[in-house]
A protein has these predicted regions:
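Long, ordered, helix-rich scaffold segments
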Residues: 1-154
Length: 154
């Protein structure tokens, strides 16, 4: 039911999502599912929604489950993550750089979707590679993240 709601175009969609949040905001597992389901949305505005969710008061990169629920799920959203503009790649790279400062192991485990650049058309592949290179060039990057991002460029 939540997936149908998230992917739908009902004029009551936003109110229903807000009501769902209000009802379950104290339940971490359900809230992780709420973030994850929205990150996997097939709607045209999924990338915008995920960016907004990253600023939500209950989203924190300090919680590995929450980070995986939003960032990990979004990075396997074929439509939104691979938007031709590169917006999804930029967003994930930004989040991974921030997450690396808090939890290098979790950040490194979320790199592989960017590393699949060889499977995509030249324009998308170039954007994915550019984000991996930007990650690698980040000052103070952890060893885990550096190794995973470097390996992903090969």
């Amino acid at each position: 039911a939540l997936t149908t709601l998230v992917n739908g175009n009902s004029d009551k969609r936003e109110a229903a999502l807000a009501a769902f949040y209000q009802r379950y905001q104290g339940n971490a597992l359900v809230l992780d599912k709420w973030f994850q389901t929205q990150a996997l949305s097939s709607r045209d505005d999924a990338a915008q929604a995920v960016e907004a969710l990253a600023a939500h008061k209950d989203f924190t990169l300090a919680n590995p489950n929450r980070a995986r629920a939003l960032i990990g799920a979004f990075s396997v959203n074929q439509r939104a993550f691979h938007d031709p503009s590169g917006r999804g790649y930029r967003f994930v790279a930004d989040q991974l750089i921030a997450l690396d400062r808090l939890n290098p192991q979790t950040a490194a485990k979320l790199v592989p979707p960017l590393g699949r650049w060889k499977r995509f058309d030249p324009a998308r592949a170039a954007r994915m590679r550019a984000e991996l290179e930007r990650i690698i060039a980040t000052p103070g990057l952890s060893k885990d993240m550096f190794e995973q991002a470097s390996k992903s460029l090969d």
